[in-house]
């Protein structure tokens, strides 16, 4: 533990030194072929309350807006003092190169986010990012499913926009979004504007389906299998002779899901992983873990790898292929 703490302190001191040398020049404190990380004082353009404990903030930071990818996050220093000492990791809900802004949606749950909620337009925040590995968008995907729960819906807005831009199709895919109640829903109009069919769930039934988004995901996949099963049997008789309908299903059908993206609490991610594995559909999961350093130094966010050992959510993730991690 002493060794890990020393690494965290050393990394923090290194960042402070780099900040003095580089931030005024707006150059990245870290750069690789995959990512550039900036440490910036970012001006708050908007900080508004969406519901009782959910807030939306817009930050002016052209460097991060130009390089951020869906699924990545920023590390925010909430206070100039020592309390809270650690930065808060918050996913990027949107990035706009034209305006040079990024957006975050956060839940007020502790000291750090309470301080964030009190910040005013025109104030600045010390932020580091973009951090982590985001969602892959493979070429050739035809009908992705996006599954989000609670505040985990936030980074999926950015993903929906990116998929819409890449696909340029009338129907980009389907989104299953779960919230506690209608009062806590957000981003719904935007998701529909991105061309996605939207299914909303609430725990109390105040809007949409009463239950979990994974219930609807499972039902959707099962319904498509039944439809494609019938279609495959009919076509096999006419064209190619007897063949297992199961093979035809794997080849896809109308609006058959070919990849699943998910972000939310662990029970949701575990269920998505199980559903995807059973249906033979690849899935990418964005994990939520407490983070201290945000750059892989302190090992505080380690999760078990499916192949043995551990992986760091902040650096190796937060997005992983479902088969890579144990949940």
Can you annotate each of these PLM segments?
Residues 29-121:
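Ferredoxin-reductase
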Residues 38, 310-327:
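Short, basic/aromatic-enriched C-terminal tail that caps enzymatic domains
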Residues 111-285:
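FNR/FR-type flavoprotein reductase catalytic core
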């Amino acid at each position: 533990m002493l060794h890990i703490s020393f690494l965290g302190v050393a990394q923090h001191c290194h960042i402070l030194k780099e900040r003095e040398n580089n931030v005024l020049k707006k150059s990245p404190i870290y750069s690789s072929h995959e990512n550039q990380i900036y440490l910036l004082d970012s001006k708050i353009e908007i900080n508004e309350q969406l519901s009782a404990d959910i807030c939306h903030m817009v930050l002016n930071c052209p460097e991060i807006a130009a390089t951020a990818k869906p699924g990545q996050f920023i590390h925010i220093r909430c206070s100039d003092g020592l309390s809270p000492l650690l930065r808060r990791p918050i996913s990027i809900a949107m990035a706009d190169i034209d305006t040079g802004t990024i957006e975050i949606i956060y839940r007020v749950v502790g000291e750090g986010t309470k301080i964030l909620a009190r910040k005013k337009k025109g104030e600045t925040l010390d932020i580091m990012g973009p951090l982590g590995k985001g969602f892959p968008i493979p070429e050739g995907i035809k009908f992705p499913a996006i599954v989000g729960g609670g505040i985990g819906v936030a980074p999926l807005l950015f993903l929906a926009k990116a998929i819409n831009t890449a696909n340029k199709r009338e129907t980009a895919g389907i989104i299953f979004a779960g919230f506690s109640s209608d009062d806590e829903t957000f981003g719904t109009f935007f998701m529909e504007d991105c061309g996605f069919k939207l299914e909303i769930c609430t725990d109390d039934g105040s809007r949409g389906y009463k239950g979990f988004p994974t219930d609807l995901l499972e039902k959707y996949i099962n319904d498509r299998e039944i439809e494609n099963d019938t279609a495959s049997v009919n076509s096999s008789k006419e064209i190619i002779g007897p063949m297992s309908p199961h093979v035809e299903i794997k080849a896809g059908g109308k609006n058959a899901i070919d990849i699943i993206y998910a972000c939310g609490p662990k029970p949701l991610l575990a269920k998505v992983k199980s559903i995807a594995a059973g249906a033979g559909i690849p899935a990418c999961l964005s994990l939520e873990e407490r983070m201290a350093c945000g750059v892989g130094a302190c090992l505080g966010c380690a999760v078990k790898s499916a192949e043995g050992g551990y992986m760091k959510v902040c650096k190796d993730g937060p997005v992983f292929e479902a088969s890579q991690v144990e949940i």
